[in-house]
């Protein structure tokens, strides 16, 4: 599997397929709205400076849950678009329509898809406990350190401020250590289950669906020996992800269809290799 050729094919398809942008219109709009409605960095800094670690943990949990809900809704539309692309690549449909972005909400797909996504995310959450705990500690201590530094007159730190920063630095180191360990543990699992949504679609069409856990097991089997390939595909999009961040999501008009077209092509090529 050549990832460079895969990405080049995805870019070519973006130019050649009419209606591709329309297929991803809803998730792009949701992403833009969520970016504009999110908390500012200044507000977060002031809040973290006035609370203890327990309160910061509750805030991060609530923000994380809100983010998960938004991501879940976005994922339903993106999965719908991906299913339409699968049919297009297999010549089971001739053109894309806006209604294809709602495929996941059909009676046949919605319940199995929600169950599969729920099981997948629950399993990944369990694998990511260290990552979540480390993230909360790192974010909390980082904002505390920044707040202390910004409150210093003319950026001249007093001995007390230096001591406070030193104490928080130890917590920051612990948080970053937990994040690193969490990533080492959770990333292989994330990629092991990365093909579950596509496998579910094929099982539903073939009449072989036997429940979400069977879908997840099939994804683990399919990804044996290819988790590194999928990881490198994601790494190749880091520059595009940074561009999306810098443009508050506006670059997603191009980037989101590009990334997910590549993901569908990856699945199609992987499925062919595994036959």
PLM region spans:
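Hydrophobic alpha-helical membrane segments
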Residues: 1-275
């Amino acid at each position: 599997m050549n990832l460079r050729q895969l990405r080049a094919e995805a870019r070519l398809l973006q130019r050649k397929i009419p209606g591709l942008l329309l297929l991803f219109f809803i998730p792009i709009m949701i992403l833009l709205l969520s970016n504009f409605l999110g908390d500012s960095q200044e507000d977060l800094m002031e809040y973290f400076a006035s609370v203890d670690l327990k309160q910061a943990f509750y805030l991060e949990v609530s923000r994380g849950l809100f983010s998960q809900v938004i991501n879940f809704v976005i994922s339903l539309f993106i999965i719908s678009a991906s299913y339409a692309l699968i049919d297009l690549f297999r010549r089971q449909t001739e053109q894309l329509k806006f209604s294809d972005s709602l495929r996941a909400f059909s009676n046949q797909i919605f319940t199995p898809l929600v169950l599969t996504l729920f099981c997948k995310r629950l399993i990944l959450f369990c694998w990511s406990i260290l990552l979540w705990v480390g993230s909360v500690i790192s974010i909390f201590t980082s904002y505390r350190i920044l707040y202390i530094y910004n409150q210093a007159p003319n950026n001249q730190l007093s001995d007390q401020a230096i001591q406070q920063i030193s104490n928080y630095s130890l917590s920051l180191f612990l948080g970053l250590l937990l994040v690193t360990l969490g990533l080492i543990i959770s990333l292989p699992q994330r990629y092991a289950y990365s093909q579950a949504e596509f496998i579910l679609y094929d099982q539903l069409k073939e009449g072989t669906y036997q429940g979400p856990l069977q879908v997840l097991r099939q994804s683990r089997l399919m990804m044996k020996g290819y988790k590194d390939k999928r990881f490198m595909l994601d790494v190749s999009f880091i520059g595009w992800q940074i561009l999306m961040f810098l443009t508050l999501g506006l670059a997603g008009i191009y980037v989101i269809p590009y990334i997910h077209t590549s993901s569908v092509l990856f699945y199609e090529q992987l499925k062919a290799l595994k036959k």
